[in-house]
């Protein structure tokens, strides 16, 4: 049986996919930073993602201070991937609002990474 995804990214773009089900998650063009830390190790910050569902928003104290975040999950296999920044309380962290953290442990590179 073939799984279908909500959104497919163009095959001409370098993409990041769910390591468990290979659903597309983000285009390399949407990558903002590789210098983030998730709860399970290194993580990337993306401007936008696809095939991702958000949980409830909650306040958490992260390495850079208090934030309101929502956990994100792969829509296809329900694997926890990281979180979405809903609100940053520190003015220096406002750039993260509306952005997404995906942990490296949960994604793979596909399409054109030769």
Swiss-Prot record:
Residue stretches making up the Yippee domain: 14-111
Biological process, per Gene Ontology: regulation of synapse organization
GO molecular function: metal ion binding
UniProt entry tagged with the keyword Zinc: yes
Domain of life (superkingdom): Eukaryota
InterPro entries: Yippee, Yippee/Mis18/Cereblon, Yippee_fam
Keyword Zinc found: yes
A Pfam family the protein falls into: Yippee-Mis18
Null mutant phenotype: Larvae display reduced nociceptive rolling behavior due to impaired activation of second-order neurons (SONs) in the nociceptive pathway and reduced the synaptic contact between nociceptors and their SONs.
PROSITE patterns: YIPPEE
Keyword tags: Metal-binding, Zinc
Record-listed Zn(2+) binding positions: 18, 21, 74, 77
Membrane-spanning residues: none
Function statement: Involved in regulating synaptic transmission in presynaptic neurons. In class IV dendritic arborization neurons (nociceptors), involved in regulating activation of their second-order neurons (SONs) and maintaining synaptic contact between nociceptors and their SONs.
Family: Belongs to the yippee family.
Protein name: Protein yippee-like
Lineage: Eukaryota, Metazoa, Ecdysozoa, Arthropoda, Hexapoda
């Amino acid at each position: 049986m073939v799984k279908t995804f909500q959104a497919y990214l163009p095959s001409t773009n370098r993409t990041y996919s769910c390591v468990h089900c290979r659903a597309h998650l983000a285009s390399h063009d949407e990558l903002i930073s590789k210098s983030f830390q998730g709860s399970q190790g290194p993580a990337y910050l993306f401007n936008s993602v696809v095939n991702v569902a958000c949980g409830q928003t909650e306040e958490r104290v992260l390495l850079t201070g208090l934030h309101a975040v929502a956990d994100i999950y792969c829509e296809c296999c329900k694997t926890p991937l990281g979180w979405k920044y809903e609100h940053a309380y520190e003015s220096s962290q406002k750039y993260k609002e509306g952005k997404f953290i995906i942990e490296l442990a949960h994604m793979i590179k596909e399409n054109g990474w030769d």
